[in-house]
Amino acid sequence: MSADTWDFWIDRGGTFTDIVARRPDGSLGTDKLLSENPEVYEDAALEAIRRFLGLSRDQPIPAARIGRIKMGTTVATNALLERKGAPTVLVTNAGLADQLRIAYQNRPELFAREIVLPEQLYARVIEATGRVRADGAEETPLDEARLRGDLEAVRAAGLESAAIVFIHGYRHHAMEARAGEIARAAGFAQVSVSHAVSPLMKMVSRGDTTVVDAYLSPILAAYVERIAAAFAGEARHKLMFMQSNGGLTDARLFQGKDAILSGPAGGVVGAAATSRIAGFEHIIGFDMGGTSTDVCHYAGAFERVLNTSISGVRVTAPMMDIHTVAAGGGSILHFDGTRLRVGPDSAGADPGPACYGRGGPLAVTDANVVTGRLRPEFFPAIFGPEAD
């Protein structure tokens, strides 16, 4: 920490953003804001930084006054839970269009009469003519002209991200790499190529992870750019994000596949550190936010997994062993005439639950207000049309 710079630790959730600031003199300050309040500020993290630095909302933040900003975010988590990622096309070999849908043929309810197929993150599939055998020999050359035409067509239809997954691509990736180049030339801002994202020999797990990366990375990139644009001077190198595995990474290296449990992973690290200070080595963590709830276990060491399923989506990447469900304080309450259903959609921070006074829907938080379980005196004055 420099003698004249500020450091910030930020937990940016789907509903609330919590901030800890270390002033140049070493003292600490905290703040809590709604993650989205467009009538008052553009972004909660930036608003908090400006408040601590004494800047108005239209003033750029001097990058020279910032030491480090370390952030955990549920931007990717909530985009996955609510299926609000970038429109994605899957590019794979001819004849393998249904490979990821068929997957391992697992059925969550073996004896159910109605078989409900899992929802896929990709909107379209392009079957590329071209194939490489397991020994690396080219069986069929890549039809570049046809692939280029197909990619340009789906790009014109509004798809923004491409996931390239070819058989044996984990080892022999020249054809995959060439397909990625064609996709970028066709105008796709985000191109996730399986041998770079998840170089694993099993095509299904490699493909699933690549699709997740393509689906979520544009959401993260847009958020990082929005943060960086608020600074006067280059600040990306000062911005770090928590990854799903509990470690920090430079904002410029933050990928969708590593961001799914960014916010929750920070909660696990924080809970473990807090429990050790209090003399506890064995804890169960319960982290209920506005959009999702996360449960973890800690017994003296962090528990990590390589393969996991989140909201019905399979991912193969190192991450904390956290169980996430789409149920939080902002989860919307639905009644279909026979039963009450909670979520998975959330009221978020804007408009938020009905009790926020912004015309939002009935949510879990409203039920807790009606039953008297929430005590207003413990909440900051950040609600309502005037955020007071």
Where are these regions (language model features)?
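N-terminally biased helix-coil "hinge/interface" segments that flank
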Residues: 1-388
